[in-house]
Every structure is written in structure tokens, then in C-alpha cells.
């Protein structure tokens, strides 16, 4: 079988709360690490989420 183009990634909160989102991205077109501004319910504000590996 062929290698899948989309991979699952974990977006870790930069606020240090331990909250994370799991999403997917196209590994061929987005080669750099993903950084997204999303809502952190623990910190109760919008913060940057940085890409990390799923363990």
C-alpha cells in the first residue's frame, strides 16, 4: 500500500497548561511545524499551539 499523505499531529498549548488538540495535516505540502492560535479552556484565553508528536 502507498504511504498516506495526511498524518495526525498533536497541537500543544504554549501556555503550559497541558491542554492539546489532535488534528491532521498534509505532510507533503506543509513540511514546516504548524503553529496555530486557538482557545485554551484551562487558561481561558487564546494562545499559540505548537505541533508535537503523538505518543
UniProtKB/Swiss-Prot annotation:
One GO term (biological process): translation
Please verify whether the record's keywords include tRNA-binding: no
**Family matches, as InterPro entries:** Ribosomal_bL33, Ribosomal_bL33_CS, Ribosomal_bL33_sf, Ribosomal_zn-bd
List where the protein spans the membrane.
none
What UniProt keywords are attached to this protein's entry? Ribonucleoprotein, Ribosomal protein
Q: Name one GO molecular function term.
A: structural constituent of ribosome
GO cellular component annotations of the record = cytosolic large ribosomal subunit
Record-stated family: Belongs to the bacterial ribosomal protein bL33 family.
**Know the name of this protein?**
Large ribosomal subunit protein bL33
Q: Which source organism does the UniProt entry give?
A: Jannaschia sp. (strain CCS1)
